[in-house]
């Protein structure tokens, strides 16, 4: 691919992830987006449930439970753009993978349940988006159900998530009375039709809120709806592209993913406004997305995507240049040149060989244990991309073996699972315990399942009095030595060899931070 055509292709890429609370409709909206992109023919192919079309559940545990534990990648064309959608676990439980996936995208679609408003999972994910000022576009879902007053939901987005919200369209009615949406910028009503959820729906438009056709649709409510829309125009933020791109304002669309309504308008806005692949910070310089030379970083490793092959796949975000099949690239951390001839791309589980990938694309590399999260690959330059963090776990368990003779297998399994990012493992300085940390409860189940399935180790969990963890660091060696001596009971080494403070309570953490002001307590750590 010539440098010019790479630059043109890069400008047309849109790489994003969807964030939402469980049950807000993320799986449904993913399915509708793929329908518009002609990536799947039948509405219903991405179900996170045990439907016959299930496309995005790989691990056998996922298939048993009917949830998507791991994030997959889907690419589809839309309006002369190439859209890369990174799916993130939407189950009641999620993991660090969800957080890290957000470091590999250029923008985010936030799906909010119109009946429930902003929920705690969304708040956590927004905090991660804040680390990089990621642009956020919002879709308020389930307008065909009885929902809260849209003004209240908008207000909640602004106050709870601390971001300005600019409605692009406004719902006309809700629940059984839902008639459609009115675009505040084009003066067009898009009319809602029932029963078109599993295909690309008809787009019936009425031009002009004050037209006779609008009167016929709105009936007795016409005057009230016009008043409400006037009020909304006066009381809400106007859409500002620069503020959106800076992560300070979110354009808001209303619709129903299940009814496949409002999704098209949102997707139109998304491909128009969302940024193409952005430049990325590395340790020595900023890498431009349109540079000729290839570079990329690994943000996620997934095991056993194919039970027949017991392999692990490293997901890599291409940051510059072009990957071509059979090319040589430098694995910077190991200082080794490797030939990559079998990278894969996915439509959730359907693997296909990649001939070529450019900035913004996600490719999968076969990994036999040498690739770790955060690894950078280049065409020879020694640089390392930054901003791919470990997040401090929020839940902890002590892990114990049923068969004490299998300590070696347990340590090997935990080491590999922690390199992969499935869990974090801590070895306290004062005893021989092994403590496992996670962001969500399901991660513990996944670890126990995989230890048994892949390493033939049966392990059980016990409660442990750890409330949170912080990576610790101090420039003054003397003060660090004193801290280590006095706090040894609470110190551990993590899977990467880093000193970690395991706080029994939040209060204990605050007191320790006050007592040792020269020691840095970090809640994230670079890979």
Curated annotation (Swiss-Prot):
The entry's keywords: Cytoplasm, GTP-binding, Nucleotide-binding, Protein biosynthesis
GO cellular component: cytosol
Stretches assigned to the tr-type G domain: 11-278
InterPro entries for this protein: EF-G-like_DII, EFG_III/V, G_TR_CS, P-loop_NTPase, PrfC, RF3_C, RF3_dom_3_sf, RF3_GTP-bd
Alphabetical GO biological process terms: regulation of translational termination
Pfam family, one: EF-G_D2
SUPFAM superfamilies with a match to the protein in the record: EF-G C-terminal domain-like, P-loop containing nucleoside triphosphate hydrolases, Translation proteins
Entry keyword Transport: no
Keyword Membrane: no
Subcellular location(s) of the protein: Cytoplasm
Residues bound to GTP: 20-27, 87-91, 141-144
Domain of life: Bacteria
PANTHER family, A to Z: PEPTIDE CHAIN RELEASE FACTOR RF3 (PTHR43556:SF2)
Described purpose of this protein according to its UniProt entry: Increases the formation of ribosomal termination complexes and stimulates activities of RF-1 and RF-2. It binds guanine nucleotides and has strong preference for UGA stop codons. It may interact directly with the ribosome. The stimulation of RF-1 and RF-2 is significantly reduced by GTP and GDP, but not by GMP.
Family, as annotated: Belongs to the TRAFAC class translation factor GTPase superfamily. Classic translation factor GTPase family. PrfC subfamily.
Protein name per the record: Peptide chain release factor 3
Species: Saccharophagus degradans (strain 2-40 / ATCC 43961 / DSM 17024)
């Amino acid at each position: 691919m010539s440098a010019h055509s790479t630059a043109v292709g890069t400008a047309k890429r849109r790489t994003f992830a969807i964030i939402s609370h469980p049950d807000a409709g993320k799986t449904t909206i993913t399915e509708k987006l793929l329908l518009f992109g002609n990536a799947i023919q039948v509405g219903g192919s991405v179900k996170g449930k045990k439907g016959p079309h299930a496309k995005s559940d790989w691990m056998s545990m996922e298939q048993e439970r009917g949830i998507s534990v791991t994030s997959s990648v889907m690419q589809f064309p839309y309006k002369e753009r190439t859209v890369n959608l990174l799916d993130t676990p939407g189950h009641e439980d999620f993991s660090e993978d969800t957080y890290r996936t957000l470091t590999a995208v250029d923008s985010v679609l936030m799906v909010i349940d119109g009946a429930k408003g902003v929920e705690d999972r969304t708040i956590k994910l927004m905090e991660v988006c804040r680390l990089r000022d990621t642009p956020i576009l919002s879709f308020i879902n389930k307008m065909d159900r009885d929902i809260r007053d849209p003004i209240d939901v908008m207000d909640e987005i602004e106050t709870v998530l601390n971001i300005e919200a600019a409605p692009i369209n406004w719902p006309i009615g809700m629940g059984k009375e839902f008639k459609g949406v009115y675009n505040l910028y084009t003066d067009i009503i898009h009319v809602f039709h029932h029963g078109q959820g599993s295909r690309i729906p008809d787009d019936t438009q009425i031009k002009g809120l004050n037209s006779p056709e609008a009167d016929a649709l709105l009936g007795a409510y016409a005057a009230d709806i016009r008043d409400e829309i006037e009020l909304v125009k006066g009381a809400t933020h106007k859409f500002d592209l620069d503020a959106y791109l800076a992560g300070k304002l979110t354009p808001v669309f209303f619709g129903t993913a299940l009814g496949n309504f409002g999704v098209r308008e949102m997707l139109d806005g998304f491909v128009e406004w969302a940024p193409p692949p952005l430049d990325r910070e590395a340790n020595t310089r900023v890498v431009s997305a349109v540079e000729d030379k290839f570079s990329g970083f690994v943000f996620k490793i997934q095991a056993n995507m194919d039970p027949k092959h017991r392999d692990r796949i490293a997901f890599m975000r291409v940051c510059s240049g072009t990957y071509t099949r059979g090319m040589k690239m430098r694995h910077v951390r190991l200082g080794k040149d490797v030939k990559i001839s079998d990278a894969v791309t996915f439509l959730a589980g359907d693997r296909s060989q990649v001939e070529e990938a450019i900035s913004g694309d996600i490719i999968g590399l076969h990994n036999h244990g040498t690739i770790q999260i955060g690894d950078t690959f280049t065409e020879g330059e020694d640089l390392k991309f930054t901003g791919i963090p470990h997040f401090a776990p929020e839940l902890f368990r002590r892990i114990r073996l049923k068969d004490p003779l299998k300590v070696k297998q347990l340590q090997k399994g935990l080491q590999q699972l922690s390199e992969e990012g499935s869990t974090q493992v801590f070895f306290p300085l004062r005893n021989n315990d092994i403590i496992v940390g996670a962001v969500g409860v399901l991660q513990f189940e996944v670890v126990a399942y995989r230890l048994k399935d892949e390493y033939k180790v049966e392990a059980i969990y016990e409660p442990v009095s750890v409330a949170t963890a912080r990576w610790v660091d101090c420039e003054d060696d003397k003060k660090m030595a004193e801290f280590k001596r006095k706090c040894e009971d609470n110190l551990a080494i993590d899977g990467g060899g880093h000193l970690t403070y395991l706080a029994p309570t939040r209060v204990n953490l605050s007191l320790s931070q006050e007592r040792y002001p020269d020691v840095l307590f970090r809640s994230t750590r670079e890979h």
